[in-house]
Amino acid sequence: MSTPFGLDLGNNNSVLAVARNRGIDIVVNEVSNRSTPSVVGFGPKNRYLGETGKNKQTSNIKNTVANLKRIIGLDYHHPDFEQESKHFTSKLVELDDKKTGAEVRFAGEKHVFSATQLAAMFIDKVKDTVKQDTKANITDVCIAVPPWYTEEQRYNIADAARIAGLNPVRIVNDVTAAGVSYGIFKTDLPEGEEKPRIVAFVDIGHSSYTCSIMAFKKGQLKVLGTACDKHFGGRDFDLAITEHFADEFKTKYKIDIRENPKAYNRILTAAEKLKKVLSANTNAPFSVESVMNDVDVSSQLSREELEELVKPLLERVTEPVTKALAQAKLSAEEVDFVEIIGGTTRIPTLKQSISEAFGKPLSTTLNQDEAIAKGAAFICAIHSPTLRVRPFKFEDIHPYSVSYSWDKQVEDEDHMEVFPAGSSFPSTKLITLNRTGDFSMAASYTDITQLPPNTPEQIANWEITGVQLPEGQDSVPVKLKLRCDPSGLHTIEEAYTIEDIEVEEPIPLPEDAPEDAEQEFKKVTKTVKKDDLTIVAHTFGLDAKKLNELIEKENEMLAQDKLVAETEDRKNTLEEYIYTLRGKLEEEYAPFASDAEKTKLQGMLNKAEEWLYDEGFDSIKAKYIAKYEELASLGNIIRGRYLAKEEEKKQAIRSKQEASQMAAMAEKLAAQRKAEAEKKEEKKDTEGDVDMD
């Protein structure tokens, strides 16, 4: 049975949650952290994923890829590329499809991976984390992504999940997942005809900022308006601090960290920590040892200075709030509560700016780091056939308007807007077109100016075939079921021809009609389904052949990672055995080995140790196993003697304890019998006495 799994795919850290035991739990990783760094690194033999990748980032900086969600679907020539590239330490390259990939050195060779592949590697890692925690099969996942993600980016994430061996039951907007988390845990929401509770959610994470206005009633939520600033997040604060110190240290220490990626990354990491310290303190020291050229750097920063550094960012706080309220057709006064989520909302000056934008105090009833993952896990559980969850209905809204167009055959019109921006999804629309034969359709963004420059206008296209004209007709009506699915992806679910036929329907008899009254009929025209048509879709999703190729590649790398981990484990086991056995041979095992055995085994241990630190330092799993078994063949004999003697001692102790217990029981029994006998004698003496008075 699969455990429903929710993934908050963060730019800096990701959070995992599962639905189980009538609740939703956060999954901790291998080092017991409640979030996992969204990092993929590459080494001489294997990949470094999550915590390992983060730990090795400074020493493996050119072969470590972070900020994964920012290059998903990113065109190499997109205006955003220049802004994104400054956050990457690995080399970004243009792929054959004009998208952005990363070039790294892996297993001694140069490799280029697409953003989808990199995301798949990380998702595969967190899938294993959930599997280790739950001890269950993991197949279904709901992944939370930013609302500003385009159709292409959502397909890329879904494909990444499939490459990782998962079924993406839903790609959900992250702030909507937080809203679901709010709705399922709140017990005081209005019901029935009561006025809905209006809640604004402000989510500022590592790289982007979203404001969403939602209406809540018990068991349901409806998104009313959403707006984003995709270049406003915690990393921008970190970068501002880093650039400040880069200038200061250039003057103060005559070093330029901008020329040294490792040094720059160390200052950036320290800047992130400083930012967090300043959230609780008005001043904080800053220092990094041997940052470059053996130079130690130190300084300090005040909260006031930080606010001045990020002043251009703070001036943009109100814009998403204003836009979200406008789309929701509400004023700030009509908002009942303002919930803040995302790690960056802990910054005091940001809190103040958000509060001022709404003119009311902020609420923190949700866990700022975990609400999205928990909501995603609940949504995944809704799709599970094996779990029963409380009913909860939610509707999101289209961030961009989408129109459908078709070959012009009969109609004057050849396109129409089907899903306007701000309309709810999932949703289905039926349209009818008169067709003269097979035709094609396409879905496109209605107003490309709503999207970032260079975004592909067309979302998908379809070929509809199998149209048969009835004899004597020059066209046939075709009904199409257009769908925006729960993940926000646009499809044509069904296409079929229809025809009008005449049928006879009985005319209802009057209530006072006699029982033998003759039934009369009338002819009516009904529209009925005639022939199903074939739909061939061309979307941003990977075709089956390419998907299978990438699945195979991922499985090969996964097998290599596993082999390297097992080899390292065997190596460590051998090393530990050498030291442990050598120590025991001189102590507790000494009486149980002959001088010849000791000499032989000591020689074997010395030889194995020399091999381990020489040619065996980088050997294969089988050789480590063979060396271990060679030592154990003699070591286990001596150990067996020791254990046998220990067992004899234990048995002797047990026998002594048993004998002592038996003696004690016998003594106790004898005492009881003596007491009983004395009691009987005393009774007998009492009965023999005669009162002479």
UniProtKB/Swiss-Prot annotation:
Residues 653-693 are annotated as: Disordered. Transmembrane segments: none annotated. Keywords: Acetylation, ATP-binding, Calmodulin-binding, Chaperone, Cytoplasm, Isopeptide bond, Nucleotide-binding, Phosphoprotein, Stress response, Ubl conjugation. Induction: Increases a few-fold upon upshift to 37 degrees Celsius. The modification Phosphoserine is found at S660. It holds the Pfam family HSP70. It is found in: Cytoplasm. There is a cross-link at K195 (Glycyl lysine isopeptide (Lys-Gly) (interchain with G-Cter in ubiquitin)). The modification N-acetylserine is found at S2. One of its GO terms (cellular component) is cytosol. The keyword Chaperone applies. Gene3D superfamilies: 1.20.1270.10, 3.30.30.30, 3.30.420.40, Actin, Chain A, domain 4, Substrate Binding Domain Of DNAk, Chain A, domain 1. Has a calcium-dependent calmodulin-binding activity. Required for normal growth at various temperatures. Belongs to the heat shock protein 70 family. PANTHER family: HSC70CB, ISOFORM G, HSC70CB, ISOFORM G-RELATED. This is Heat shock protein homolog SSE1. The lineage of its organism: Eukaryota, Fungi, Dikarya, Ascomycota, Saccharomycotina. The gene is SSE1.
